[in-house]
Amino acid sequence: MKRICSIYKSPRKNEMYLYVLKADGLERVPEGLLPFFGTPVHAFDLVLSPERKLAREDIAKVLENLDSQGYHLQMPPPDDDYIEHLPEELLRRNDPA
């Protein structure tokens, strides 16, 4: 079951991608998703098959979503920037001398 897929990147969120069947284009993408995603920017086209490996997505889930809902939304990886790092002197403040 090979699928020719168009992948679009989000102009609003770095590393967020939208996979759609090339033949369908964006017509099956829900209207409510586009304000969140932004105006899709075409990144590239790709032939997807169960044997193909994807860097950050499960190919079986992508193909299932394409068949059932007409699109797959790849969310960006978790951002670790929200973790605050304490200065070394604060980390050692309660250490025994």
Curated annotation (Swiss-Prot):
SUPFAM superfamilies in the cross-refs: YcgL-like (SSF160191)
Source organism, top-level taxon: Bacteria
Domain YcgL, first and last residues per copy: 3-87
Stored Pfam families: YcgL
Entries under HAMAP family matching the protein: UPF0745 (MF_01866)
Protein name (Swiss-Prot/TrEMBL): YcgL domain-containing protein PSEEN4034
Organism: Pseudomonas entomophila (strain L48)
